[in-house]
Amino acid sequence: MRDPDKVKSGPICDTVAVIVLEESDDENALPDVLHEVQSPHTSDNIPTSSIKKFARPRGWYNQSVSSPSEFFYQILTTERGTRRIAYVLSTWEEDEKTLNFKAVSIVLISQNFHPKAFKEILLEISNDLRTPEFSSSSELIRFLTYELVEEGSTIEIRTKTLHVELGFELIPISPVTGKDVAMLFKMLGFQNVIKIIHALLSDCRIVLASSSLMRLSRCQNAILSLLYPFEYVHSCVTILPDSLAEVLESPTPFLIGVLSEFVTSFGDENIVVYLDNGEVHVPDHAEIYKSDDYYYNSLHQRLRDVMFTTTSQEDLSIPNEERIEVDDFILDKKLRACFIYYFAELLYGYQYYILYTRIKGNFEKKLTTSLTFHVGAFRGFRKLTDMMSSSLLKSVYFQTFILTRALPRRKHDLFDEISCFKELDQLIFKQNSTSSESKKIIEHISCELIQKERYMEKCSARKQEIFTKIHWISGKELAQNNNSIIHTVKPKMRSNVILQAMLPVVNTHAEYHANQFEAYAHRIEALRNCLAAIFEGKVAFASKSLDAVKSSMRFAPLRIELCRLLNQKCSHDKLTDKQFEDIALLMNAALQAECEEDKDGVVRSLMYLSNVYSRKVAQGMQQYMYTAVQEHKVWKNQRFWTSCFYYEVHEMLFSEMLQKDRKITESLWCHTLRPCAMEMINTDDTDQEELVKQENEMIQAQAKHFANILISLQIPLSEEFFEHEDAHRSVLNEKCKWIVNTLDSILGVTGRINGLSLSRIQTYVEAHVESLRDVYVEMSTGEHLKKGNFDPVLAHGEFLISDPIDCYLLTSIEESEMSLNRLENLLPADGSLFLTNYRVIFKGKSVDINATNGTIVQTIPLYSMESFKKLTNKKLIPTQLIEKGVKIEHIISIRSSCASSIIIAFDEDEINNMAIEKFLEVIETNSHNSFAFYNTRKDMKVVENGSHKFGTLNSAIRGFTKKKTDTRRIRSHSSHRGSIQLSFDKMEELDYLKKNAHIRYAVIDYPRIGLNSKIVKLRMSHSNLDYTICPSYPGNFIVPSETNESELAKVAKGFVEHRLPVVVWMNENGALLVRASAFTSIDMVKKLKKVVNYRRNASKLTGSMTGSQQTLHSKASSNEESSSNIVAGAEIKSAEVQMNYIAKLSNSSQRAVSYALPTQYADKFSTFNDGCTLTQNNANGFPTTRIHRKALYVLLEKGHGVKIPIDSNAEAIMVRSVKESELRRSLQRARQICSSEFQVENRTSFLESWNASNWPQCVSRMIELSNSIVALMNLYNSSVAICLEAGRSITTILSSLSQLLSDPYYRTCDGFQVLVEKEWLAFGHYFHKDTETSSPSFICFLDCVYQISQQYPTAFEFSYFYISFLAYHSTAGYFRTFIDDCEEKRLQSDANEFYLPDNLATINVWEFIKLRNRVSAAFYNELYEQIGDIVIPSSSIPQIHMWPFLAETHLKYGSPYDIEPASHEQQLVDPDYEEEEDWSKLNNTDIDERHLNRRVRSPERDPANMDMIRLLQKSYLTELFDASDRKTTTNGESNGKETIHELTPFTVGARPVQCCYCTNILTRWSKAVHCKKCRIHVHEGCVNRNITIGNITHTWDAKPFEDIKMPSGAIQIGTPQAEKMLHSPNNTLTRESMSPPTANTIPPLCTGYLSKRGAKLKLWVPRFFVLYPDSPKVYYYEDFENWKTAEKPSGCIDLVDFKSFNLEQTGRRGLIELHMKNKTHRLLSENINEAIRWKECIEQVIRD
């Protein structure tokens, strides 16, 4: 044990050295150490050779002209981690031979901070070295390095030209700043300084930039001093040399100063402080924590008062006080006092929360006192909730702080004194930062700092110039003492006294915690009454207040009081079933509200109480409470168990010392009780061996006790654990390993001797499992089986959002009626209703045990919820419940748009009205949130910045590519208008887009149907990329090629919601299918009539039908006519645009064919009946032999017709379609016919009700109209434009069905996906028009598909389940595919989700189906055969069957369309059910061969051109992504001729250059290329085929480094001879162990420069690495030349002990971590692609 009265001593300086750069031709030559003197009394010296670069940060070079000398200091770190200060005097020496001036630096290293004094000493030494006749420097250096001085003394040194006085401290108690802090605040401002200090404490990387050496030194010293009482523990470099600029890309925290004249790029992730102009640059992604608002704002206020003292006097006409300028020295100390006061407030009372887990230490290993800090208890006591306090108390800063200040008998400093001020207790509680007491504290702190520094350093200023020649001879010995130096050691500055523990007064805080219980007195009284009623068996009284008491557990005083009351009632440890359930409910509610830090000790208290309370389940068998409280995350938090164990050992130690137990305080912790640990620690060494033995026994006993508690809370009492052997074994092994690891980490800190092995833990666990097995058997079969104790199987990402509620599930039809689903005869069922973020789940068992003993599950998607309805008809109550005596008061029907209704009933005696209303309220609140975007739009807070707010498709892709590691960009070479040009070299760029992005857009289908043909007068328009013309349309669509971009906006104004006519499909005969909304109101019709009248008087547009040919106008003539037809007046002009556009659509077919319809087909396809002008029957009822056709037929709603001129070659057809409102009502009636409430009120038959719903008529009418459209396009060869209503619903149904009937491709799985994406998603269908109901149009479309598949069972590749699956999930909200109503909103949603973690992101329905197809054929139609003809289904009502999806009820496993939960439910019920493989983890890019072989592909129109079609599709997508960017960049720019420059390899010289792409620095180790013409330099990793600057494109053909011919030197060293070392019987080491492989014919597998972390200074140093394919070692050299010239490697990394490989990206660079058995190697690459290349090569060598 150290002697408290012993005073330490040491030398003033550790090292004095002279460094000189001799003349050399090498630009990279390093200087020589001319002379060096090291103190023999210091063992932790810094080698002078390691600081040569730091002595001259601007670089070592000689010059022809002398320059003034410079002085600065560097803060360095020794190998043991202690800080040293290197004072450097840089000057110039004249060389007599060359007449140049050599660079000379005199370095003095010390641990004392006296810059002024040491500068004078260095000048004195320099002056003496230049005057050989005067040699006092030897004696001065001897005194500084050899003389021992007691700590606390003041040394005065006098010579003829020197007089300095300085204080001596081995370990400075507080920093010395002089005027540095005042200078820092004046340069940056106090807000920036506060930001910097908090950034340091948040582990940010900070770069200080300035052009001055001394400014960097002073500012870094000021910043480090403001951290007091903390010490900066990360990398700290005062001035970084120019050659080490790559350190700025280190991923670890640092504080580094750089010279702004050399470094131009400071890294995108670093905080940069520009000292010269006072600017601070903070990256957007930097996280800087700040304290609570009171402490943070108080610091601002105090700094403002100190810096601007006259603010309160400036507005007065006669100031009360005379303005006095504050000296910078005094201002410096006041500013430091504000920060000391700030940290004292944050850490006030920390002394009480230090846990001593071992006082005497392990006697055998001679360990010292072991201690930790109870973070959670301290934060709870101080009520700290901010992120900074949490981060700071767990950081390395605070751990170092505790280790140096926790011991009671030590020398106290200023912070110890300030942190124990009595005034702080009340000031923090009152939160009065501007009080007079606060100002007094700041004055006191500043006075203490001033008093210390005033006699720490005194010196006389030197004014004469130094000489220009050094005569010191290398190796010269120090001269003997010639008494030329007078030095005096004055008495100590302060008495070096070891004091007892200093503790603050926390009475005010303790009283506050005690008084807070008064604010909750009424709630505490309710809790006491409820617990009293529970323990007394008053069930009815307790149940009335149980819900309210459970809700009040969110308040901390209530949770604390619950623990106290349960602790007092321990005598009632044997509970009844009802008591057990109620207490478990309250304990779970308390644990749910507690955080993992356990601030008030509630979790620790309940941990012990759960092992006390139990209930009797059988004779001699008990179920303890810990089996009911295991589902909380805190039990899996290792930090909680560690702090809990330390606290228990801590209390055991001091209970032993006090010989009594400590009482529980107001927060269940005993920290603030006196005497505390720091007061009771005895440092006496008597009987130490016996005390250590007692401590070991105590810790071992506590470890066994905690092992039992861990086992009890980790082993589950569940069916999965006890019934399934595989799960039982895996859970058992996992829990055992976790318990062993937890105990090992705990006991390892306390210095254990013998721990608990894995075998012993397994023995304890097996014994515990055996005792639990009997309890489980009794619980699962006996009378203790809890009603409704069914845990639902949840989908991935699904979780409960409310507590389950007990209820009964009733049948949805009457018992007397014929049930469509025989499973409904199993109802009523008794169980629980669960509410998750996706579904409402009922799970239970049938009331009639004779019906079935299986589980009944029924689900409804939450997003599809339509309404609640309270049923009052008593006939709905089943007779089984009446016979059981169940009192049913409330019957609720929950209706859904995609599943059958759930009818639930509640027992009046068990569930009160409040619980029912609360549960339904939670359902209603969450029913508007889809599961697909639940994390994005509700719980997950996505950072809002500019890159997330996408308005166009192009900007969305730019947002996507920002997440990629490669900086390549997509550039299109296609023209702005006309046909799409292929860009084959851009195809692979699509791999960098978001996965499966090309599936979502309709544009990929246009090349397949021939819209890219030059014959077709169509083009793709990009005018809607910003969604301004029509927000509900896609960004690109097909329009006539004769239409201008500016004309489209005018055309759109004539249609509802601006949904103008666009082409969506083309038949093989050239007929087009056009979709649009209806024409606008009657006003627009009047405008069109005016145009018609005008055109009749001056007909300009003519069309002729001669023979079999149709004469069409050319593009030029159409433009002339359109321009000539414009007359004065806005109305006529606007309507003229509509007419011209209709005419252009009619003239845009591929070719004109015969207009005569054969007689034999006319009666079959003429089906427009009501108001249709197409059918012209003769007297016999058959069509005439020749029917005149039009090029375009426009389908309009009957009653909303528009007369189109005859000469426009188009005609309007009035049809009677189904309105969307009628479709909605029909679907609702169709769903209601199966509900019991409908059957009770309507005594009609089922078929009559089905026909009365009008749903079959709607489906029939849709098929009938689709057949007519197909007839027009295939037999009449005419184009059809569907313009009905808003163009979102009925138009979409008819357009989709027409394409489905005509094109066999759409009847395949891939084709149907494209059809839905194109017609329903891209063109803006409302799947959920409002928050209450969902659109019935998509259900009607799928019903039509089902009817067609019933008539043609072999025509579709997909199955009935596929159709029902899409129908279910179109309203369920599980997939993001059907959530938003237009392309623009989907882009925004996908962009937000792209930044979510992988566990929160969801997939679309098509990805799900593809993954499922890998393991199941449920979505495929086994009867599918290739049918290339048109399908014409019957539309008669007798042929329309009821779609079972509309009435089906699933009670066995839940909805089968929730595939994953349903399969797991089936696995739980059916033991013989074989679970399929984990298909959710499969890669959908791989194709299952069995499905490829089984599936029959539909015939394409030109199979020989399939590859071209795929390229066309990708080219269209590239055009889609780049159109907006191309429009913005080409607008207003001249189309200059493109010039191509070639990039060539480039070697960087001594001076770094800047990369013109990423703006980072190119060093001599960087792989670089440059353009000789443009004089640009680029990283090789930044080049992506080309770099365009203006009209100049720079190309680069990358050549792999491995293709370079091996140097002859490298081949020579490839076959080294085994050169034996000095022979020894035990020495077998040869040079082969450090040499590359011996095979000279094998080239290296991978080579290149990587930065390696240094061992001493922890800096990143570039090395040349070589990996051979036949050697398990990675060799590295100093540079490429060393490898080339066959030099010996500097070292190697042995891959024999390789464990794992970790790859991370830090900015532009890639960080490689090679984890070996006993060591981890960290390497930095130039870019992430280089790191990936090394990873693949290393893995290849390991595999081989």
Swiss-Prot record:
Domain PH span(s) in chain numbering: 1643-1743
Gene Ontology molecular function terms on file: guanyl-nucleotide exchange factor activity; zinc ion binding
Domain annotation Myotubularin phosphatase: ranges: 996-1447
Residues annotated as domain cDENN: 165-304
UniProt entry keywords in alphabetical sequence: Metal-binding, Zinc, Zinc-finger
InterPro entries for this protein: cDENN_dom, dDENN_dom, DENN_C, GRAM, Myotubularin, Myotubularin-like_Pase_dom, PE/DAG-bd, PH-like_dom_sf
One GO cellular component term: cytoplasm
Segments of skewed composition (Polar residues): 1102-1116
Domain uDENN: 14-150
Changes seen on gene knockout: RNAi-mediated knockdown causes no obvious phenotype.
SUPFAM superfamilies listed in its UniProt record: (Phosphotyrosine protein) phosphatases II (SSF52799), PH domain-like (SSF50729)
Region (Disordered): 1102-1123
Domain dDENN: 306-412
Domain of life assignment: Eukaryota
Domain GRAM: 787-871
Residue spans, zinc finger Phorbol-ester/DAG-type: 1540-1590
PANTHER family: MYOTUBULARIN-RELATED (PTHR10807), SET DOMAIN BINDING FACTOR, ISOFORM A (PTHR10807:SF109)
Its job: Probably acts as an adapter for other myotubularin-like phosphatases.
Family the UniProt entry places it in: Belongs to the protein-tyrosine phosphatase family. Non-receptor class myotubularin subfamily.
Stated name of the protein: Myotubularin-related protein 5
Gene that encodes it: mtm-5
